[in-house]
Regions:
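Short alpha-helical segments that sit at the start of domains
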Residues: 1-11
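N-terminal helix-turn-helix
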Residues: 19, 26-78
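Intrinsically disordered, acidic Ser/Thr/Pro-rich low-complexity regulatory segments
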Residues: 82-343
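Short helix->loop/beta-hairpin flanking segments within DNA-binding domains
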Residues: 10-26
Length: 343
């Protein structure tokens, strides 16, 4: 990204407005940042930025504020920066989370969201992997007792779901395993979103072959597949939006809360963004910053920050990048350690 004088002025306008909430004028830019440009030059550049839609005039002040387009430009600029600073206390807290060896990736992402919410004073959301579009690659059974067995479902993107099946006796468990073997041959390669329909179609065939035992398997599998295809999400810090000065308008506040509580809406919002990992709804004054969390080459979902358009993008983007990079590094090291043990 070639950085011109207008780019510098736009960046400063966005940062000053984020910090103060007050419209920004040419004189305040020059005085606050010791700019070596004349007032006329800065005013002229601001007029050009306004005419191209990057900043806009408010009704109550002669200063200017960033438009949605201006925020997008600023976010793209930050995303291209290689060494954004990250709050040291946040880094320490995140490393403490990583040191809890017994935790799952999902637990780590959830705890990361809690401290991100505190750092950014915004709502944070963990979105689980979108498994519905993935293909099933295996179903395996692990016996846990003489009357119980756990079915493990795995997709081509490495996402895993499980369901424990309980029966009355060993003979019935044997029948259950036969059912699973039958289904394994017919379900592998099926999209997760199509599994329930395929299971329903196979019900009569399986019942003819294996009798009543098939009902136990089918009901358990259908429950697991419905759960598999659902969007999983956990959110933190929703109450922080209640105290945000940008959300005095109750309708705008409700729009932000609705987005946090609806994983499908949030996914759609993220997909609709003109800048990768950033989306906005100008009318409702809602912005979403998100980052993919990849572990060993597979997506484990996204962490998203939801708030008004006026939020601390520099801090948020730096923290999201840090979490993604540290998670990936941590699990790469864990994988290498496991491989060395196997050798």
């Amino acid at each position: 990204m070639n950085f011109t004088r207008q780019d510098e002025i736009l960046k400063l306008i966005v940062e000053d407005f984020i910090a103060s909430g007050e419209p920004v004028g040419s004189n305040s830019l020059i005085n606050n940042h010791n700019l070596q440009y004349s007032s006329a030059t800065v005013r002229n550049d601001m007029m050009k930025l306004e005419s191209t839609g990057f900043i806009e005039k408010t009704h109550t002040s002669s200063g200017r504020v960033p438009s949605s387009k201006g925020y997008r430009y600023y976010v793209e600029y930050l995303k291209n920066m290689k060494n954004l600073s990250v709050d040291e206390e946040f880094k320490r807290e995140f490393q403490i989370i990583l040191q809890k060896k017994s935790q799952s990736i999902e637990d780590i992402m959830n705890e990361s969201c809690e401290i991100l919410s505190e750092l950014t004073n915004s709502a944070t959301v963990v979105l689980g992997p979108d498994a519905a579009s993935e293909n099933l690659v295996s179903i395996s059974m692990i016996s846990i007792s003489s009357t119980a067995s756990t079915a493990i479902f795995v997709t081509d993107k490495g996402y895993v779901e499980h369901k424990t099946i309980y029966v009355k006796n060993e003979n019935q468990l044997k029948k259950v395993n036969e059912c699973v073997a039958f289904l394994n041959k017919r379900l592998i390669g099926t999209k997760v979103s199509q599994l329930v329909g395929k299971l329903e179609a196979l019900k009569p065939i399986l019942s003819d072959v294996l009798g009543n035992s098939s009902n136990i398997v089918m009901d358990s599998f259908i429950e697991a597949c419905v759960k598999f295809a659902q969007s999983r999400s956990m959110y933190h810090g929703a109450t922080k939006l209640l105290n945000n000065s940008e959300y005095q308008n109750k309708e705008k506040l409700q729009a932000a809360l609705d987005l946090i509580q609806s994983p499908e809406k949030l996914r759609e919002s993220i997909k609709s963004g003109k800048v990768e990992g950033f989306s906005q709804n100008e009318e409702e004054d809602v912005a979403v910053l998100s980052h993919d969390m990849e572990i060993n080459g597979f997506s484990r979902g996204k962490i998203a920050i939801v708030g008004p358009q006026r939020m601390d993008y520099r801090t948020i983007i730096g923290a999201l990048k840090y979490v993604a990079e540290e998670l990936s590094k941590y699990y790469d090291i864990e994988s290498e350690a496991e491989e060395e043990k196997d050798d």
